[in-house]
Amino acid sequence: HEKTAEMEKGMRTGKKLTAEILSGKWDEALKSFIWITQRYSSRKTLCKAVASYCEIFGEMPVEIYSAPGRSEVGGNHTDHQHGRVLAASVSLDAIAVAGRVDEPLVRIQSEGYKLCEIRLDELDKKTREEGTTKGLIRGVLAGLKQQGYKMGGFCAYITSDVLSGSGLSSSATFETLIGTVVSGLYNHAEIPAVTIAQTGRYAENVYFGKPSGLMDQMACAIGGMVYIDFENEEKPQVEKIDADFEKAGLTLCIVDTKGSHAGLTHEYAQIPVEMKQIAAHFGKNVLREVEEKDFYAELPVLCKESGDRAVLRAIHFFAEDERVVKEVNALRAGDWNRFLKLVKESGDSSYKYLQNVYVSHDTVSEPVAIALAVSERALADKGVCRVHGGGFAGTIQAFVKEAAVLDYKNAMEAVFGADSCHVLKIRRYGGIRVIG
């Protein structure tokens, strides 16, 4: 992954780093990142994080790292079927203040959570840690160690504005951040972004116990707008797409519907399970290996064999996988109207066929559906909206024409509360050492 151009050799103590930040020494370096938002326009966030680190772990040499949230733009639930996706890292992020220690112990304090301590000679999976932050940390450390990367003890204080369970992939952000810290502290910041992403997915699947594709981690680790083809999942094809949304007069908005993904792992997990059932009918492992014409030829049999929902979800996959290619071509051609039309089609397909807008047995709580309805009314011809990420709860995505952003934000916050509509930028960088 990329290193900061402004990086200087030699770690600074917390006290020295705070003084440098307050003096403005790092202002130009920070401004050079396209992703710096209001969180960084004040130096308070970084200084507060450094102060919290020193309060918990003591005064010692430290560095600052960052990993972004991500927004999937196209390819809703295609990655776990070895399909294609279009995703972007966004200007919400998690930052870590981290410093090396001599003992083989990793201690991580996330703001608002309990301190996690993991010994580096005890990296085997612990079943009781499934679904926990500690499980994710242990998984990332184990995965990197298994691949032969240098490992050592460190302390880290983490603060994040990537909402948990919100469809911005807070878990992938966290995994990327831990991998980036290990890379920076012990491996000369030379662990490839793709390796950090694959290790994060390993941690999530094996140690955390949640089935997921690789899209979230790839978008967080690599950064920018990325087109990823997972046909060969061990060596995914990754291409950065140069798309200037600001120049096109479009703004990415993420609306937090205040419904969390927490407790919805089963609903989320059923999607790959059902898609793989359809693939298994053809003797294949995933839908990417199945010919679409063969699928449609067997439709009546598949409906009886796997049920209508599984078939509808496969219908979504085939159309969505092709749609990603069309979206990429539209962006390359600068055809923004075509791109927006395809984004809307993606959302419609997720709603009708993938069926990940609400939980079928919970008719009382359908906040994503409400958000989409309110969005369509508020936007009219001034933008498009869709469910993104895992779905079922959390957030929706909207691409809004610049002149309509304030009205859209007001309309959404009238329903979901103050600060529920996040106006974002696409961040150029993935996991990165900011100061070190």
Question: Which residues are covered by each model-predicted region?
Answer:
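C-terminal nucleotide
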Residues: 3-70, 95-130, 227-386, 398-436
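DPxDG-like acidic metal-binding loop motif
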Residues: 89-91, 168-188, 397-400
